[in-house]
């Protein structure tokens, strides 16, 4: 088949939809997150159907997309966010899970649990018993964490993107310290703060970037949580990654955007927003998906060589590799 190339200028990519191959014994049940380790291996988390309890939620592939291993049935039914962090000579996975699983955890790259945490009741914003409940609570008194971002001191930030709409700060031992945000109309308040990242690109003070998804914006904060500014012009931005001078923004509205050093778009990849309007529930109809067009990008990350991996919130799952041309 002819190659599909998308992008513009210096940012052109060869599209490989359905890049990693799952063994027949597993199925993708709504892919949610992607991350890569130092060796270039790919980690994918899917939500998973809670009825299929013994099915893994995390899948590992080599840089060519060949299956290595799977684990994480404890997150099945709520698997959401995944990030890889180097700590000394080791690397670890940080997992966020929502729905009835509603927890976050630190794992080794082979799936052993280092620690496992539920709602931080000391934050004072959660319903009684939220840390032991296994029913999703979609109110602002619920805990439904979506993604994490890593701080220099070994601690991290956790976005409670579907629950309290707060950003929680933890130390390196996963002890809760403080939080900021909550529900509101912007400028430090959120509607679905779904994604989070620390922007450490050169030539600027490090900033916290929060995907304020339902407002179609990115909000920027100083590392102490002080609100700085808002970037507009997105379509349900879901998460963030950075590499060199670029920032990557997967948008649920059928687009993966690359921002340059001044945070203006330098490429909008696979954008097909009109198609979402034309075809109801396109996410459930793979026969209507078009090569080189996205449906619902939910997470994306750069590889060390500047390729991009994209996870889409679609039925049956889809992980696309965009190989730099």
Spell out what each predicted region is.
Residues 1-325:
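Eukaryotic scaffold repeat domains enriched in small/polar residues
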């Amino acid at each position: 088949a002819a190659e599909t190339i998308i992008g513009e200028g210096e940012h052109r990519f060869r599209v490989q939809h359905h890049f990693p191959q799952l063994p027949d014994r597993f199925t993708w049940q709504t892919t949610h997150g992607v991350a890569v380790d130092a060796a270039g291996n790919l980690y994918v988390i899917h939500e998973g159907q809670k009825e299929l309890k013994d099915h893994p939620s995390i899948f590992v592939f080599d840089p060519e997309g060949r299956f290595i291993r799977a684990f994480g049935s404890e997150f099945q039914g709520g698997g959401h966010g995944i990030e890889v962090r180097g700590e000394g000579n080791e690397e670890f996975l940080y997992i966020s899970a929502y729905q009835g699983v509603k927890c976050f955890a630190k794992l080794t790259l082979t799936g052993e649990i280092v620690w496992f945490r539920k709602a931080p009741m000391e934050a004072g914003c959660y319903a009684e018993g939220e840390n032991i409940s296994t029913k999703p609570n979609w109110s602002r008194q619920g805990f439904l964490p979506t993604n994490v971002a890593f701080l220099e001191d070994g601690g991290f930030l956790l976005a409670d993107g579907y629950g309290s709409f707060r950003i929680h700060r933890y130390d390196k031992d996963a002890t809760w310290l403080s939080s900021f945000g909550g529900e509101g109309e912007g400028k430090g308040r959120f509607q679905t703060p779904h994604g989070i990242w620390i922007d450490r690109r050169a030539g600027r003070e490090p900033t916290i970037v929060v995907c304020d998804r339902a407002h179609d914006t990115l909000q920027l904060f100083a590392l102490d949580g002080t609100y700085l500014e808002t970037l507009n012009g997105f379509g349900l931005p879901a998460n963030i990654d950075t590499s060199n001078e670029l920032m990557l923004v997967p948008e649920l509205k059928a687009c993966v955007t690359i921002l340059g050093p001044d945070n203006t778009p330098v490429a909008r990849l696979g954008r097909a927003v009109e198609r979402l309007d034309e075809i109801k529930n396109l996410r459930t109809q793979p026969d209507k998906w078009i090569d080189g067009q996205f449906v619902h990008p939910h997470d994306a990350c750069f590889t060390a060589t500047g390729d991009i991996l994209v996870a889409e919130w679609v039925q049956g799952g889809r992980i696309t590799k965009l190989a730099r041309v």
